[in-house]
Regions:
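DNA polymerase processivity clamps
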Residues: 1-178
Length: 178
């Protein structure tokens, strides 16, 4: 799948802002999934998980998935906006640059958590009594136009939405009267 860097840049910026520092190597990067639904880039820092979606092109979709480490993601984000990047089952390429997938096993539970948070069953989680729920906006400041949608029952997860992005973040519980 061929994608202009201009379209890819917001997703790469979101992932770079979320990962790094003391993040374990198996999640310090982006998990790439290509299917008929389009190209999806997953990232997490153990508190927040995001899915960026790049719309499918007219090319027939070849299904593949792999992990790109943070160095690869940073290299892609520094490319000129007018360049095109090609995602294939063997890795990512753009003109004379080739990036091979990293040898890491991204935890698939991240994808399941995001999918579950965006299903209506999420609303059936039990009401939490005796706690105030808060979110640290500093953890999400790098995501442009992000909206936090708190759980209506006070559960400790909130949905995240931004252009081309969906995800969830964990809350910080504060006992009443603390």
């Amino acid at each position: 799948m061929k994608v202009p860097v201009r379209e890819l840049k917001p997703a790469l910026t979101n992932a770079i802002g979320l990962t790094g520092g003391d993040t374990p190597s198996m999640i310090n990067g982006v998990y790439v999934v290509n299917s008929k639904a389009g190209l999806k880039l997953y990232a997490t820092d153990r508190v927040t998980a995001i899915e960026n979606r790049i719309e499918p092109t007219v090319e027939p979709a070849v299904e593949f998935e792999y992990f790109l480490d943070r160095e690869a993601v940073e290299l892609l984000s520094k490319m000129a906006l007018n360049r095109a990047v090609t995602f294939t089952p063997d890795g990512v390429s753009s003109q004379n640059i080739e990036i091979k997938p990293a040898d890491e096993n991204f935890p698939k539970t991240v994808i399941e958590l995001i999918d579950n948070a965006w299903k209506d069953a999420w609303l059936e989680l039990p009401k939490v009594e005796g706690w105030d729920i808060g979110y640290n906006p500093a953890l999400l400041k790098h995501i442009k136009d992000v909206v936090i949608i708190p759980h209506p029952n006070g559960f400790n997860q909130a949905r995240l939405i931004a252009p081309g992005l969906r995800g969830l973040t964990m809350a910080k519980k504060v006992k009443h009267g603390s």
